């Protein structure tokens, strides 16, 4: 029994080291740095065409932004920043969505981009919304993808005691996150990605792989913890964003069974933003499982409608 336990421990340690080495390789040399009023900001570029900024969601970074926008890079030049507290980006004392929006304007100055479409997923929708409000002359189109926001004075995401304990256990610990993601990936997809894991059995291989990739790319979780906690605060706090002031053409996308309740949020936003278009699929969860191609198609058609 002792020898078996030692062997199992050695295997686990080796598997963990291999995963972290692969993660470091995946992140290395893919991103760039720019100076902003809030400090350094990490970003990556993919594709060619009209510029579109893809602002990642909770637990992300530039790598998640690239994944969210990978189909769009066939049509657009995707700019994928790491928001405050994620990977190599700064975490200033003011890490509000408004401050993040202003820092993104500085990033665009560095890239010599005057105007572009802006998409924000999950908690990234807060920053996208603030960008549209604060920099209306620079935002040609706005896409709010599974928007995580408190529009009613009631946090739409409520974890039970066991869920909260699990989340707290993995935040900041790469080992704990890796172990739980390896041993109970479906439970992690439900808890962290707010998606019914039963959907994995009803979608094609590419979509199952995408779900697994989103989960795997939360590593290193320790380099995203500040951003995760910041997102939890701002997405649960009553939104101060003047959504009614948004003038850019707006597309809002969600799934009815999103366990973070973004379908209800999407409907409220569609009522507040003049002329907003709304699409809600019956199922797909918070990572719109089974609808990645649909999301890309909706965004491309929406953005292209106003361009010759």
Set out the residue ranges of the language-model regions.
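Conserved alpha/beta-hydrolase "acid-adjacent" motif
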Residues: 259-265
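Alpha/beta-hydrolase
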Residues: 162-167, 171-241
């Amino acid at each position: 029994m002792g020898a078996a336990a030692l062997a199992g421990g050695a295997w686990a340690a080796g598997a963990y080291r291999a995963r972290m080495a692969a993660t470091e390789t995946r992140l290395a040399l893919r991103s760039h740095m720019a100076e902003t009023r809030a400090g350094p900001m990490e970003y990556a570029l993919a594709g060619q065409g009209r510029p579109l900024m893809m602002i990642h969601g909770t637990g992300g970074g530039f790598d998640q932004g690239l994944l969210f926008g990978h189909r769009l890079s066939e049509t657009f030049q995707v700019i994928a920043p790491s928001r405050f507290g994620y990977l190599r980006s700064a975490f200033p004392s003011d890490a509000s969505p408004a401050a993040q929006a202003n820092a993104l304007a500085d990033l665009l100055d560095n890239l010599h981009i005057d105007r572009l479409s802006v998409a924000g997923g999950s908690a990234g929708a807060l920053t996208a919304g603030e960008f549209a409000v604060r920099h209306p002359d620079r935002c040609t189109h706005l896409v709010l993808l599974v928007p995580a926001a408190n529009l009613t004075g009631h946090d739409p995401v409520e974890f039970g005691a066991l869920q909260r304990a699990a989340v707290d256990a993995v935040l900041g610990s790469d080992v704990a996150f890796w172990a739980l993601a390896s041993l109970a990936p479906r439970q992690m997809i439900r808890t962290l990605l707010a998606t019914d894991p039963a959907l994995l059995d009803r979608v094609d291989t590419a979509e199952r792989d995408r779900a697994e990739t989103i989960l795997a790319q939360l590593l290193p979780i320790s380099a995203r913890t500040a951003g995760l906690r910041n997102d939890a605060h701002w997405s649960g706090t009553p939104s101060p964003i003047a959504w009614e002031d948004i003038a850019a053409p707006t597309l809002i996308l969600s799934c009815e069974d999103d366990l973070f309740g973004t379908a209800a949020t999407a409907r409220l936003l569609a009522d507040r933003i003049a002329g907003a278009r709304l699409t809600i699929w019956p199922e797909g969860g918070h990572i719109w499982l089974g609808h990645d191609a649909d999301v890309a198609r909706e965004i491309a058609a929406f953005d292209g409608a106003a361009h010759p």
